């Protein structure tokens, strides 16, 4: 390509032609970036049916397992809240759903979190820490080394645990807000893993995880980050949301 001295020797018409070609080349380069493939290099997950890694999720899917179960007793007493009539106040008309096992289990020491802080942490934040670590390991990375220019895009839309914690006024402490605040869910990942890229939480209801992946792809193509962690988490721990959905006829009876 011509340098500045070469350009000075060109006629105005040739200089304009050169600049147009250079501008076109830059535009084409930008357009190529917008359609460049993005590699999925690692996964971490928890799904109903005991799926805790990509291999077990594939087994659940390939075997066509039905992961819908009756609402576990450690969530709430379904007999107390069930009524087949959707108009009954304070009741839900379904006894079933898709639930994860052992959502109260968490190795706080591994993540450098005190027992006191871990108690006030929403289990959704705990799950995000675990699966993010596993995703990086699955990608062949060493999470403890940290990665600069890595974005975090997390979908969240419900915080049953936060309502429980804040509902006990005498038990509210310095960790109660950070343990249940949506924005902290992404920030905690970035801080713990030593990441310096974009870090955000998105709430678009049922589409949240897809939107998080979409935003991650946009950020990668814009050059805001070189690697991105994207996903979502949703735990139903108390009956209120099911009661609300029942009143809106959003739940299948089976």
Label the model's feature ranges.
Residues 2-4, 29-254:
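Cys-dependent condensing catalytic cores that perform Claisen condensation/acyl-transfer
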Residues 5, 9-12, 16-19, 26, ...:
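Heptad-repeat coiled-coil/leucine-zipper oligomerization helices
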């Amino acid at each position: 390509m011509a340098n500045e001295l070469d350009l000075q020797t060109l006629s105005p018409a040739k200089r304009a032609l050169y600049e147009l070609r250079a501008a076109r080349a830059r535009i084409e380069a930008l357009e190529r970036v917008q359609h460049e493939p993005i590699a999925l290099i690692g996964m971490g997950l928890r799904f109903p049916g005991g799926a805790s890694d990509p291999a077990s999720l594939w087994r659940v899917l390939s075997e066509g397992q039905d992961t819908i179960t009756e609402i576990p007793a450690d969530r709430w007493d379904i007999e107390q809240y069930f009524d087949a009539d959707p108009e009954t106040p304070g009741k839900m008309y379904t006894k079933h759903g898709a639930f994860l096992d052992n959502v109260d289990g968490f190795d706080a020491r591994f993540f450098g979190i005190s027992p006191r802080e871990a108690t006030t942490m929403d289990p959704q934040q705990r799950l995000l820490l675990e699966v993010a670590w596993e995703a990086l390991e699955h990608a062949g990375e060493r999470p403890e080394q940290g990665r600069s220019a890595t974005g975090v895009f997390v979908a969240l839309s419900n915080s049953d645990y936060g309502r429980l914690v804040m509902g006990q006024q005498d038990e509210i402490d310095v960790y109660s807000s950070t343990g249940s605040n949506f924005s902290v869910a992404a920030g905690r990942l970035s801080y713990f893993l030593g990441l310096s890229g974009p870090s955000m939480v998105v709430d678009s209801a049922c589409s949240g995880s897809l939107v998080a992946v979409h935003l991650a792809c946009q950020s990668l193509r814009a050059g805001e980050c070189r690697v991105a962690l994207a996903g979502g988490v949703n735990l139903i721990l108390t009956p209120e949301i099911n009661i609300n959905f029942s009143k809106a006829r959003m739940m299948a009876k089976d």
